[in-house]
Amino acid sequence: MFIEHQRIRFTPVPGGSTGVAQRLTLDDGSDVFAKLTEDGPEGISTAEANGLHWLAEAKAPVPTVWCHTESLLVTDWLEPGEPTPDRASELGRSLASMHRSGATRLGAPWPGFIGVLPLDNRGLDDTSATLEAPGSADVLHLESSRHQSEPDSAHGTPVVPTVDWPQWFVLRRLEPFLKLSHDNGALDDGDTALVSTTLARVPGRAGPPEPIARLHGDLWPGNLHWSTDRCWLIDPAAHGGHRETDLATLALWGGAPFLDRVLAGYQEVWPLADGWHDRIRLHQLHLLLVHTARFGRRYRDEVLEAAAGV
């Protein structure tokens, strides 16, 4: 166990946006990754640990959680590598399998975060102030959450349909960040009215109902870690949702390397519904609004472009 080892070397790791990241070399010569979010919101590390455990249940390519507290997360150290077409194809197949493992509900049974911003993981009709995370907040090791739907015996596909997904997506994933973006001045009154009009169109543009998928939830290209043997998923905001959301956000900000191979690998395992390409901007709108809510006006034009494309 991590707590039984002495840490003999601390090496800062660049790129962390939600805390101080370090590579810790232990007394037995092994390395782990540690992220400290001491100044972040309470529970942010617990939320990430919950998500990693939950995705690992589906055999997703996520690092193993060694331990965590409310502000510290320790996981496997993943050696950096280079993206390759074969690793991209494998990533696509892994994503399809992860999504297909499903969830029994939209959202998640723990309070969520995306970056440092709260993420409302309640279901569509849940009016409670918050949800309790499984387990005690002060334990280092967390039991894996078991909230997955029973697979269809013939296809292994979860049978819970996402008939409520469009309304849930608007209520829990779009409206909160639109409000934050207006409150911080990233979007003015006219911008907000335009995006609000787009939100009213979501139910008619959402495509056919699908089973609830097990999502990474913050899958922009920066949350892919290309290692020496495969691509790993890091920094999740995991929850039950629509699988096209994860795939759409992979195309943001230059797109994931070999994205065509990722999508081809995905289609081998779980083909996408007709018209999925036309729904990309709808699904990207969530993460773009998260960015105006957190970083301000510099993402305004991308939000408006996505809204116009819905």
Model-predicted segments: where are they?
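A mid-sequence, solvent-exposed acidic-amphipathic segment
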Residues: 188-231
